[in-house]
Curated annotation (Swiss-Prot):
GO terms for biological process: biotin biosynthetic process. This is Biotin synthase. Its EC number is 2.8.1.6. It is an enzyme of class 2 (transferase).
Length: 335
C-alpha cells in the first residue's frame, strides 16, 4: 500500500458514524494534523456535497451601540477597561439603522447583523432592539443580533420581533476560556445559547484564532462548536485583529496556513453550516482568501467596518469575487 493510500485510509477512519454528533478533541486534532493539501481537498469535497462552491452569503455588520462594555475580553477594543481610543456611543437612531440596512441590501447583502456592546441587555433594551429588528426585517433582509447574555424570555421577544439569527460566540477552547475572559464563563455562553435555541432562533456561533492558543486549543474550539446539538447554522471564524491598548495587542501572528486549516476543519466537522470569514480579513491576501473559499468558507462580512475594526472595501470584495467567479446568494437562496 502506498504512503498516500495509508493517509487516505487514516483520514477516512477519522469520520464519525453518520448518526454520531460528538467529535472528540483528539479526532479534531488529527484533522488539523493532516497534510495541508489532503485536508483542503477533503474539506472541499464535503463542501461540494452540501453547497454550491461558487456561492457566497454576504452579511453586513453594524454596531448599533458602541463601547463602554463591562466585560474584560482581552481581544476587544470595546471594553471599558482598556484605553483603545474607542468612544462610547449610545444607541443609534432607528431611521439611521434602516438607512444603513437599505444600503447594505442594495449592495448585495442578504443578512443585516446588528451588534451592541453590552454584557447583557436590559428589558428596555430588548424593546428598543425589537423595534429596530421589525424595521430592518420589513426590508426583506435576514436579521442577526449580538446583544450579549440573555435573561429568560428575551430570546422569545427577539424571535417575535422577527430576528432570524442570534450571534453568541464561544470565543476559544473551553479549557482556556478563563485565560482570555474573566468576567464570564464558558458555561454562561452555553446558557444563553440554550435560551436562543429553545426560542426557535437560528444560531450564529464561532470563535477567534490567533490569541496565542496552541493547535490543540484551536481543535478544542472547533470541537466545542461542532458538538452543539444541533450545530450552528452559521459559524464565523475570526482572526484576531490586534488593537493597541488591549491585553492581546502583542499576540504572536498566526501562520496563514493554520488559519486555512481552521476553516477546513470547521467545514469537515460542521458540513451543513455556513462558515464565515469574519474579522481579520483585511489583513488576508487574496490568495489566502481564495484558499479559504476552496476549504469550505462560504460567507463573508461585506462592508468597510466590522463593529470597530477595519474590513476590506466593498469594491475590493467585488473584484475578488469576480476573479474567483463567485456570486452572492440572495435572501431567497439562504436557508
Amino acid at each position: 500500500m502506498t504512503t498516500y493510500s495509508l493517509r487516505l485510509k487514516a483520514k477516512n477512519e477519522l469520520t464519525p458514524h453518520p448518526t454520531a454528533q460528538y467529535w472528540r478533541k483528539c479526532q479534531v486534532e488529527e484533522l488539523f494534523d493532516l497534510p495541508f493539501m489532503d485536508l483542503v481537498f477533503r474539506a472541499a469535497e464535503i463542501h461540494r456535497q452540501h453547497f454550491d462552491p461558487n456561492a457566497i452569503q454576504l452579511s453586513t455588520l453594524l454596531s448599533i451601540k458602541t463601547g463602554g462594555c463591562a466585560e474584560d475580553c482581552e481581544y476587544c477594543p470595546q471594553s471599558a477597561r482598556y484605553d483603545t481610543g474607542v468612544e462610547k456611543q449610545s444607541m443609534l437612531d432607528v431611521n439611521y439603522i434602516v438607512e444603513k440596512a437599505q444600503i447594505a441590501k442594495a449592495r448585495g447583502a442578504s443578512r443585516f447583523c446588528m451588534g451592541a456592546a453590552w454584557r447583557g441587555p436590559k428589558p428596555k433594551d430588548i424593546e428598543t432592539v425589537s423595534a429596530i429588528i421589525k424595521a430592518v426585517k420589513s426590508l426583506g433582509l435576514e436579521t442577526c443580533g449580538t446583544f450579549g447574555m440573555l435573561e429568560e424570555g428575551m430570546a422569545e421577544d427577539l424571535k417575535e420581533a422577527g430576528l432570524d439569527y442570534y450571534n453568541h460566540n464561544l470565543d476559544t477552547d473551553p479549557e482556556r476560556y478563563h485565560q482570555v475572559i474573566h468576567t464570564r464563563s464558558h458555561d454562561d455562553r452555553m446558557d444563553t445559547l440554550g435560551k436562543v435555541r429553545s426560542a426557535g432562533l437560528k444560531i450564529c456561533c464561532g470563535g477567534i484564532v490567533g490569541m496565542n492558543e496552541t493547535r490543540a486549543e484551536r481543535a478544542g474550539l472547533i470541537a466545542s462548536l461542532a458538538n452543539l446539538d444541533p450545530q450552528p447554522e452559521s459559524v464565523p471564524i475570526n482572526q484576531l485583529v490586534k488593537v493597541a491598548g488591549t491585553p492581546l495587542e502583542n499576540a504572536e501572528d498566526l501562520d496563514w496556513t493554520e488559519f486555512v486549516r481552521t476553516i477546513a476543519v470547521a467545514r469537515i466537522t460542521m458540513p451543513k453550516s455556513y462558515v464565515r470569514l469574519s474579522a481579520g480579513r483585511s489583513n488576508m491576501p487574496e490568495a489566502m482568501q481564495a484558499l479559504c473559499f476552496m476549504a469550505g468558507a462560504n460567507s463573508i462580512f461585506y462592508g468597510d467596518k466590522l463593529l470597530t475594526t477595519e474590513n476590506p472595501e466593498e469594491d475590493g470584495d467585488r473584484v475578488l469575487m469576480e476573479k474567483l467567479n463567485l456570486y452572492p446568494l440572495s435572501c431567497s437562496n439562504v436557508e
